[in-house]
Each structure stands twice: as structure tokens, then as C-alpha cells.
A protein has these predicted regions:
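C-terminal beta-sandwich/jelly-roll accessory domains of carbohydrate-active enzymes
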Residues: 221-297
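Structural motif
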Residues: 134-146, 205-210
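Carbohydrate-binding surface patches
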Residues: 195-238
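Hydrophobic, well-ordered secondary-structure elements that form the walls
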Residues: 44, 76, 149, 215-217, ...
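Catalytic cores of secreted or luminal carbohydrate-active enzymes
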Residues: 143-193
Length: 297
């Protein structure tokens, strides 16, 4: 666009349709990658274009392709939705995408749910943000922040020095769980669940062999239901028996009164039962997440 264009976030837009611009960027970026041990770069795009221009996108594809050919071991993460950089075309040249500059776990829960129509877990970056989110000012429990990030390609975007001992222990627990389960989850199908309670946002990730699953049941707001409804799962082998465990039962709050079979142990249930009847979970505060995993018995 012209030099007198309106600024966005105090920035102009590089004309990626211009081969000279692409050559300049390739030379500068490639020099850095050649001279330093860099394994990952993030391509930020945080302002709208001054006008619609498909050549801008194709030019970006061309630059990424050259960088990938010259540096095949360097991973590229494309950012962000605000710049329209998440599309199926860009996935030919990048390993991950970044949904938004907001790391507010409540907003991320919804974003990731909607993006799951198109993007698998392995390519969707999601980070544990600071105690107070820089884009919303909200303060969320470390468990909620960590489990929302663990739904996707997990990372951290925070100062760990702010963590209490209890928060540090919880973050370590969730991170270890993510590492222990990432291999099979990278190949899993994400299926959105449809809980009867509109306050709940939930999904299930099922291994291709249907022998493992994990369900994330998030409380997006205060529920109007005095008694939580069963959450029906999907995508399972109806004839298989699954050992079902509430991974984070230690996060049970005062919102849950009475006892629940998942509070202390593992249930063995058929896939048919889990899909037809569902699972009864303890009640929860808003901005909390239950994590339910199952393995074929």
C-alpha cells in the first residue's frame, strides 16, 4: 500500500506481492537462521491490510516456501487470526498456527472449540498465560489456564517467578500429563460435544484405534443448573470397555456437594454407555475444567 496509509498498531504493511520485498526478507531471515541455532520462528501479523489483496497472501506463501526449503528443520508458527494468516493454504508451509494474541483462558476455551472445526490439536498453539491476562485483565486459576493450554500444542507465555509453590506444582502436573499423552493425541480426532447445559464447552479427543480418549469439559460461565447433567461422549467403540478416570479430581471445589464415583477411583464403562448415557461429573465453579480420560480395558 501507499506510504501515507493509515497506521495499524503504529505499523505499515510490507508489500509481500513485491518480489524485491520478499527477496530482502528472505536474505535477512535466512542469514539469521544460518548463523544461529534457531529451531522455531513465529511470523506475526497483527494489523489488517490497507486493502484486500490476494497477491499479499500468495507472496507470503512464496517466502515461507523458500524458507522451508532452505531451512527444513526450522518450525514456523503463523500468527494470527487478526491478520488472516490462518488458512488451509498456509498449512502447507507452517507447522503451527496461533489463534489470537489473547491468552485469556476463558476466551481461548471458546476459540479453540470453534477452531476445532478446521485445525487439529498438533498445529494449534496454546499457551499458559500470566495470572492476570494482559488483554482482558481477568485473573484465572492456574489449573484452568494450564488445562486450556493442554488441549492444544502447549506452551508458556508468563513469568514463572509469579507462581506460588502450589501453582508451580499444578503447572508441573499438567505439563507432565501433556508430555505423557502428546504422541497419541497428535493423531487424535477432535470431536465437539454438545452438553445439555449451555454453560459447558466440551470436546473429546479420540485415538484413531478408539482405544484411548480424553474429554475436556470446561465451565465457561456460572451454570443455571442446580444438578449437573450427564455429559455424553462420542466417537468411541460401543462394544469396548473403557477404564475412565477423572485426571484432575484434586481440583474439586465447594461447588460440588456429596460424593461422586469418580472422586476416588476408576470406572469401567462400555463405549456404548458413555455415548448413550454419558458421565456424571461433580459440579464446578465457572472458569474451571474437568479432564476425563479413558483407556480400553
Amino acid at each position: 500500500g501507499p506510504l501515507d496509509q493509515l497506521l495499524g498498531r503504529n505499523q505499515l504493511v510490507l508489500d509481500m506481492a513485491n518480489a524485491d520485498v520478499r527477496d530482502y526478507l528472505f536474505g535477512k531471515i535466512s542469514t539469521v537462521l544460518s548463523n544461529h541455532d534457531v529451531s522455531y520462528i513465529k511470523w506475526d501479523h497483527n494489523r489488517v491490510l490497507p486493502h484486500v489483496d490476494a497477491a499479499q497472501t500468495y507472496g507470503t506463501y512464496s517466502l515461507f516456501e523458500r524458507l522451508r526449503d532452505a531451512h527444513p528443520n526450522v518450525e514456523i508458527e503463523s500468527c494470527s487470526s487478526g491478520g488472516g494468516r490462518i488458512d488451509f493454504g498456509i498449512m502447507n508451509y507452517t507447522q503451527r498456527v496461533w489463534l489470537s494474541d489473547s491468552n485469556d483462558a476463558a476466551e481461548r476455551l471458546r476459540m479453540q472449540h470453534e477452531a476445532s472445526h478446521f485445525l487439529p490439536m498438533a498445529v494449534t498453539g496454546s499457551h499458559v498465560g500470566p495470572r492476570e491476562c494482559h488483554t482482558s485483565g481477568r485473573i484465572h486459576d492456574i489449573g484452568f489456564r494450564a488445562w486450556v493450554a493442554a488441549q492444544r500444542h502447549m506452551g508458556f507465555e508468563m513469568d514463572p517467578r509469579e507462581l506460588t509453590d502450589a501453582e508451580r506444582a499444578k503447572l508441573k502436573q499438567v505439563t507432565q500429563w501433556w508430555k505423557d499423552n502428546r504422541d497419541w493425541r497428535h493423531k487424535a480426532d477432535i470431536k465437539r460435544l454438545a452438553p445439555a447445559d449451555p454453560a459447558i464447552i466440551a470436546e473429546i479427543q479420540v485415538a484413531p484405534e478408539q482405544d484411548r480418549f480424553v474429554a475436556f469439559i470446561g465451565s465457561a460461565e456460572t451454570s443455571a443448573w442446580s444438578c449437573p447433567a450427564s455429559v455424553k461422549l462420542t466417537g468411541l467403540n460401543p462394544n469396548a470397555m473403557y477404564d475412565v478416570t477423572l485426571v484432575n479430581r484434586d481440583e474439586k471445589t465447594a461447588a460440588s456437594r456429596g460424593t461422586n464415583a469418580l472422586d476416588t477411583g476408576t470406572l469401567r464403562l462400555s463405549g456404548g454407555f458413555l455415548m448413550a448415557h454419558g458421565v456424571d461429573l461433580p459440579n464446578h465453579f465457572p472458569d474451571r475444567m474437568w479432564v476425563l480420560e479413558g483407556a480400553a480395558a
